Amino acid sequence: MGPDAKKQKLQSEDHLQNDLPVSCFLAWCKKVGLELNPKVYISTEGTVSQYGMLAREDLSDGELLFSIPRSAILSQNTTRIRDLIEKEQDSLQSCSGWVPLLISLLYEATDSSSHWAPYFGLWPELDPPDMPMFWSEEEQTKLLQGTGILEAVHKDLKNIEKEYNSIVLPFIRRNPEKFCPMKHTLDLYKRLVAFVMAYSFQEPQEEDEEEDIEKDILPPMMVPVADLLNHVAQHNAHLEFTPECLRMITTKSVCAGQELFNTYGQMANWQLLHMYGFAEPHPQNCNETADIQMVTVREAAFQVARTEEDRLEMQKRWDFLCHIEIVGEEGAFVFGLEEVMTEEELKACLKVLCMSTDEFAEYKENDGWEEDEDNDEQTLLTQEISRLPIPWRKLLHLSAELTLKAYKTELSMDEALVNDPTAYAKLSSREQHSLQVQYGQKKILHLLLELTKS
């Protein structure tokens, strides 16, 4: 980065530090013992999205960016209504497991006297990231068809409304001294769900606790400052958890003027857009994936079947695969750039759908158990798909073709836009992010077509 660019960044830093919400937040950080390295600063300029953190000076690998005492974290255990939440914990059980935190946010975010008021002051209107759940239905369909995001958003909205009406609203009505249905509305709840989805952290399980993971799942929590760092797959910072505090540490050297990036995990672009409202430009996301819905493979098998009797046989095999929980109506086979993430399920499905009648009878008699000739521990690399048995490849090829038909545009059209800076710049941010999602998915699906062609 040249000196002019660095000077511009430092000027934007000075401008932001004079911004009232940010200056109030930074003052609060000092008050609660949140220690920020003087070599970094918070900004909305020069970042990939909204707030971010940039380096004022060069940083070395392993350098502490900031530390956050656990008392500054906002969770169901630190909110002022923690006793009430604990008292009503049985009635706050939900599939998401987020209700206690969301109720804490409903209370703290709407009270100007809250300990975390300066933190919420960074988002004066509590406006969430520009996630697809807040787009119009027309825009959702236009930009997201075929990506899997559309179905995920519809499921989210249905679950949010159900959770609010069946759990949260009754809680609000039982506690009128602290809550009000006119103030703590479904719309506000939806926005706070987006905040939790985009900004919350979940403490990882200790290794010796893995066996009890279903029993002792730790609830999400809001971590000031840490949630301001943006994400890229090739990140340069990492959040560490200690008994006393949380610490953000650099994982590589960072030059002055560069942005600090945390990681949200190994996330494909469709997941990033769905949960965080952005996507990484191709080819920067090394975690990109494409899904083929399991029911699409079933549809391909039906199309391959020559007679009605063959189709009935395929249905029997599909039903059996569902019975032994290899496939499901809402499941998907996931293909990455380097490997197949659902190798075991994919191989079992293709094998059963393509085996002879006698082989299936024996397989069914053994309830799906058989002596594996393959090494179960060996990962199926994407490039190795070309070595699968011919009938398997034909079925997978047709499944990829059917998946591609669900999109509104062809890969060539997406490629032309991505490679034309002028045309790409004219797109809205929503259009750009959606394009990156579709382009990455279609590239992988076309790779599958190439690897499975006869």
From Swiss-Prot:
It is an enzyme of class 2 (transferase). It is found in: Nucleus. GO terms for biological process: negative regulation of NF-kappaB transcription factor activity; peptidyl-lysine monomethylation; regulation of inflammatory response. Its EC number is 2.1.1.-. One of its GO terms (cellular component) is nucleus. The keyword Methyltransferase applies. It holds the Pfam family Rubis-subs-bind. It comes from the Eukaryota. GO terms for molecular function: protein-lysine N-methyltransferase activity. Keywords: Methyltransferase, Nucleus, S-adenosyl-L-methionine, Transferase. Residues 38-265 form the SET domain. Protein-lysine N-methyltransferase. This is N-lysine methyltransferase setd6.
